[in-house]
Structures are given as structure tokens and as C-alpha cells.
Amino acid sequence: MSKRLVVETHASSCYFRTSVDDGERKALVQITERCNLHCAHCFVSSTETGTDIALHDMVETVLPRLRRAQVTRLTLTGGEPFAHPHLLEICAATARMDLPVKICTNATLTSDEQITALAELGNVRVNVSFDGFRPASHGRFRGNRDSFAVTRETTQRFADAGLLHGILSTPNVLTRPHEFTELCAFAADLGAAYVLMNPLSSFGRGVKSHGRLAAPEQTMRAIAAATAPLADRVELVPIRFPNDTRPLSGCDAGTLIYVFANGDTAVCPYLVFAARTPQSPHADREFLVGNILDGEIADALDRYRFHDRYQVGANPTCRACAVNASCGKGCPAAVIAAGQRIGAPDTEQCPPEAIRLPLIPIPSAGA
């Protein structure tokens, strides 16, 4: 079962839309480092070269060890998963294990034969990335203007086959708010469950591109307003959009795990992405529990209790905040990416001071 992390009462500070029930885990597996595009925001700085997880390793080692670590939901990522020569065989192995799987793709390398085969498996759904809805925005942001037409056409084919699940988008300075109205309408017309939008972050290639390509706050607010009328047709998931009033969501590290193509296994992908940035005061090894190709990871994950190791919100600002008791303190990875140690405020998401500072009673004149 999936558990929603995006709720009306809290700002959506975590990069994930859903988690899993207590006692279960969700795993994202980077089956390849390789990608045919060169996206300005890529968390793992993918290029056309890199490591693949071998089919034998994936089927005989990775998947069984993930199952023994209580993984009940799986996402295949990259790089570009369709660049992996054995994607279909990997998905067939998950079907034999009765393991639901999502594929996150740029939808530029998928053949009709692959779509037919994936649809026949019955356990696969696909999330497609759209970073704008024009060649001059999506295509340019992804390093190939021609990619937009291919992605749009392939997404239609995914939908026709019953495979399309969600649309993933990173608003940026190349996009215009009305594009997201068009994108959400497109998603709704195709029967997508949701459109997830999150800003360009300082992870991977985004460290260098953030300053010149990140969408400003005014644009993010305009996108939220432009897409709001579509909320009755498709679920809108604005991640880390400007927050005016709400306490922050919390961190599910240890439940939402990540396997890198070399087998390194993380308690959260974003903590490792952030720790690998030049500004990080934390080392990536703090968030790695071992290598799944070398041995079992279930016990190491069970022993790793993020909130016992680190105290989020351990700072005067949070302690004095009026919403402290109901606040999850936001995303520790975002704190690290901002050059701070875990425990500092997630200032990018904190509501304004007028909300955070408690009112001080004014004594009456006769007191």
C-alpha cells in the first residue's frame, strides 16, 4: 500500500509524493547511469556513458535482497531506464515476484514492441518527465529541442497502452506559467493520475545551473495559480513551492531507499545527492548502509534510524516557532544542499516570520 506524503495541512517539503505503510519500504533503483539527453537539472549528472546493473545481478541478487528488506514497491530510474538493454527482462522478473514497478523515463527511446511487452506484464506503470510544454523550454532544458515532440508522442502511446501513471516536471526560467496549464490539461486528457512539479534544486548538475535556470518565486506562484483550475481533472502535486502559512512535512529516510548502479544503497537518494555537492558539510557515507551487490541490506536498514542519529529542527528558530509542535521540519537534504548541517531550518520552505513568531500578550493598562 502507498501512503501519501502530500497533505493539505502541511507544506510539501519532501521530494517524494508517496511512501509506504509502516514495516514496508519503497526502493528506487538506478539500473543505468547512462542517458541519451543532457538535462540541466540532472541529480546524478548522467551522460551517454556509465555503468549498468547487469541483468543477472538485478534478477538474482538485487531484487531478492530488496524483497528481504521489506520492499513492496519499486521504481526503476537512471540515467534513462530505456537505455538499459535488459529493461524488459528486469520488469518481467518483478512481475514474477508480484512486485509493482514504476519506470521514470524521458520517453525518447521506447519502441512500440517495448510498450506492448510492458503492458502485457500487468505490473508496470510509467512516469514521464516534461520540463515545460514547448521545444524551446522542455527541449532546450534537456539538451535536445527535438526531444519534445518525441516525448509527447511516446507519452500518448504509453497512455493508449494503459501504462501512463504520472507526469514529472521541473519548472525553470525557460518555461512560462501557461505551459503548465497546457501540460496539466494534456495529462488529464491522457488519464494520468497526477502531475508532480518541483523546482530546480542544487543537486548534481543543478549545482551549476540553479543560479541561472531556477524559476523565481514569482514564477512558481504564477504556475500554482495557472494550474489550480485543473485540480478537478488531475491531481496537482506542487513540491517545495512557496509556502505562506503551513508547517512543513517531515523526512521518511530509511523507508524510501535508493540503490545506485554500482550497488551502493542509500537511506534516501536526496540525502546522498545533497551530500555530494561542493557546499555540503556532510559526507555521503553518512547516508549509505552498504552495497547490495556485496551483501544483504535488510539488517543494516533496520539498524539505521535517521531520527535517532540526527535531530531535525535543532536550532533556536525552530524552537521559537509558533508551528513547531506540528512541523516536520522539512527536508534534511535541502538543508544540506543549502550548505547547512542537519538540524538547521529548511529556510526555503519555512513560512514568513509573521506566521512563525508567536504573539506576545500585551499587558492591559491596569496590570
Predicted regions and their residues:
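Conserved C-terminal portion of the radical SAM core fold
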Residues: A69-T75, M97-K102, N123-N127, A149-I239
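Conserved alpha-helical substructure of the radical SAM core
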Residues: S2-R125
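Short, small/polar residue-rich loop motifs at catalytic or cofactor-binding pockets
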Residues: S249-G254
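Radical SAM enzyme core and accessory elements
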Residues: M1-D21, N262, F273-F287, Y310-A367
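C-terminal accessory region of radical SAM enzymes
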Residues: P216-D244, L271-A320
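Short glycine-enriched, charge-decorated loop/helix-capping segments at active-site entrances
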Residues: S45-D52, R140-D146, H210-L213, A337
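Conserved radical SAM core fold
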Residues: N36, P81-A83, A107-D112, V124, ...
